C-alpha cells in the first residue's frame, strides 16, 4: 500500500488531529458525529483506526509500519513504546518536532532534496534513525537556509520536547537523548496498534 497523498482534512475529520500530516484541526464534536453516523464501532474497527492514525501521522506506507512493528516486537521493553520511539526518532519526524518543517511530508521533502545534514554529512534518507548527540543542520546554500527559516518563523512556538534543542539562528538542532513516552507528538493508544498487527498474523 502506497503513502497517502489524498485530501488531508478528510483524514483528520475521521481520525482526529494528525499534526504530522496537517496543522488543521477537526471541528470539535466532529468525531462524535462520525461515530453516531456509522453506529457503534467494532473492536476491530477501533484497532484499525488507531493503526491508521499512526500511519497517516508519520506518513508511512503499510509495509513500512509493519516493519517497524516487527522491529519493536524483537526489542526489549513494551512493543508499543518501542514502536513510538522508533517512529519519533526518524529524521523527518525530528525535523518536524524541531519546527524546521511544518509537517512530516514537508520534512521528508527537505531530506529528499538534500537540504539536511546530520553530523556535517548530507543525509537524504527520511527514515534515518536519529541518535543522542546527533547534530542536524542545513546546507550552507541560501535556498536551504531560507526554506528552514520560513518554517521556523511560521511554526507555532510551542515548547520543544526535552530530547531536542533548537538553535534557530544557526539553523541547528541537537538530539539530546532518546525520546521518552511523555513527549510523543500524537495522542494514540499504541497497544491497540500492536493488537491490530498481532491479530493479522
Curated annotation (Swiss-Prot):
Free-text function comment from the UniProt entry: One of the primary rRNA binding proteins, it binds directly to 16S rRNA where it nucleates assembly of the body of the 30S subunit. With S5 and S12 plays an important role in translational accuracy.
Keywords noted in UniProt: Chloroplast, Plastid, Ribonucleoprotein, Ribosomal protein, RNA-binding, rRNA-binding
Ribosomal protein found in the keyword field: yes
S4 RNA-binding domain mapped to chain residues: 89-152
Localisation: Plastid, Chloroplast
Organism: Chloranthus spicatus
PANTHER family for the chain: 30S 40S RIBOSOMAL PROTEIN (PTHR11831), SMALL RIBOSOMAL SUBUNIT PROTEIN US4M (PTHR11831:SF4)
Record has Chloroplast as a keyword: yes
GO biological process assignments: ribosomal small subunit biogenesis; translation
Pfam families: Ribosomal_S4, S4
UniProt-recorded name of the protein: Small ribosomal subunit protein uS4c
Assembly mode: Part of the 30S ribosomal subunit. Contacts protein S5. The interaction surface between S4 and S5 is involved in control of translational fidelity.
GO cellular component: chloroplast; small ribosomal subunit
Classification via InterPro entries: Ribosomal_uS4, Ribosomal_uS4_bac-type, Ribosomal_uS4_CS, Ribosomal_uS4_N, S4_RNA-bd, S4_RNA-bd_sf
GO molecular function: rRNA binding; structural constituent of ribosome
Family statement drawn from the similarity comment of this UniProt entry: Belongs to the universal ribosomal protein uS4 family.
